[in-house]
Amino acid sequence: MPNKRLMLLLLCIIILVAMIGFSLKGGRNTTWPEKVIGDTTGVFQNIFHTPAEFFAGIFENINDLKNTYKENERLREKLDGQTQYEAKLQELEEENKSLRDELGHVKSIKDYKPILATVIARSPDNWAKQVTINKGTQQNVAKDMAVTNEKGALIGKIKSSGLNNFTSAVQLLSDTDRNNRVATKISGKKGSKGYGLIEGYDKEKKRLKMTIIERKDKQDVKKGDLIETSGTGGVFPEGLTIGEVTDIESDSYGLTKVAYVKPAADLTDLNNVIVVNRDVPTVDTEEEGS
C-alpha cells in the first residue's frame, strides 16, 4: 500500500512538471488543465491579495500616524520653547528699561551717592506705611536717607527703627503719621512760586497734604504746579520730585491754604529703588523729622 501511494505521488509530480514545461513553450494554445490551474491560482491570488493590500494600508496609515504624532510633539516642544523664550525676553526688556531709568536718575543726582536697592518685603498690615529693601548699614545706608523710585520720584525715607545690617525699612510718603514731614518747593510754568510743608497723607483722596507756607510775589498756587523737595529741612536733598498739585483748599480756620499733591511715584507698586546717600549729616528739625 505505501508503494502504491508513493508511485501515485511521483506520477502526479511528473504530470505537473510536464504541464509546466508545456506552458513555457510559446506558439501553442493553453490546455484545459493549464486553464484550470491558472484560474484556480488567480482566484486564490485575488482572495489573498485584497486583504493583504487592506492590512498593508492599515499598517502604512498607522506608521504615518505615528510619524505625525512625533512631528506634532516636536513642534509642540519647539513652540513651548519659543513661548518661554519670548516671556524671558519680555522680562529682560522690562528689567532693562527699569535699569535704564535708574541709570538716568543716578546721573541726575550726581551730587549724591546713590545706593541701588530692591524691595523685598511689604506687610499687608502696613502696606501704605513702609516697605523693606535689601540694603542696610553694610551698604552705607543710614537713617533718614531719602529713597526714590527708579525714575527719581521721592517715595520716603529710611526709618531708624527698621535699619539693620543688610535690610532697611522705608517709611513711605503715604504713611498718615503727621510727623512724616517734607519741606517742599512749589514751581509753576514761570518758575518758583514759594514753599510749603507736607504734613500727612489723606487716605480717602489718596493725596499728600501740603500746607502752603510762603508765596513769592503773592503768586497763587494752581493745579498742575510741580512740588519738589526744597532741601531746607536737613533730611531730604533739594530737587527730588514729589508730585503735582491737584486741588487747593483753605484750612478749617481759613487762615492758610492747603494743597493736595498727587505723588509722582506709584506708592502701591514699588520694585527697584534708590537710596540717596548725602555726605552731609542729617539734622532733626521741626520742618522735617521722623
From Swiss-Prot:
This is Cell shape-determining protein MreC. GO terms for biological process: peptidoglycan-based cell wall biogenesis; regulation of cell shape. Belongs to the MreC family. Keywords: Cell membrane, Cell shape, Coiled coil, Membrane, Signal. Gene3D superfamilies: Rod shape-determining protein MreC, domain 1 (2.40.10.340), Rod shape-determining protein MreC, domain 2 (2.40.10.350), Single helix bin (1.20.5.490). It comes from the Bacteria. Involved in formation and maintenance of cell shape. Required for the formation of proper helical filaments of MreB and for cell wall synthesis in the cylindrical part of the cell leading to cell elongation. The gene is mreC. Disruption phenotype: Loss of viability. Cells lacking sufficient quantities of this protein undergo morphological changes, namely, swelling and twisting of the cells followed by cell lysis. A polymeric material accumulates at one side of the division septum of the cells and the presence of this material correlates with the bending of the cell. After prolonged depletion in the presence of MgCl(2), the cells become very short and fat and eventually spheroidal, but no significant lysis is observed. Addition of sucrose results in rounded cells. Cells are still capable of making division septa. Residues 1-23 form the signal peptide. GO terms for cellular component: cell septum; membrane raft; plasma membrane. It is found in: Cell membrane; Cell septum; Membrane raft. Pfam families: MreC. Residues 58-111 form a coiled coil. Self-associates. Interacts with MreD and proteins that belong to class A and class B high-molecular-weight penicillin-binding proteins (PBP2b, PBP1, PBP2a, PBP3, PBP4, PBP2c, PBP2d, PBPH and PBP4b).
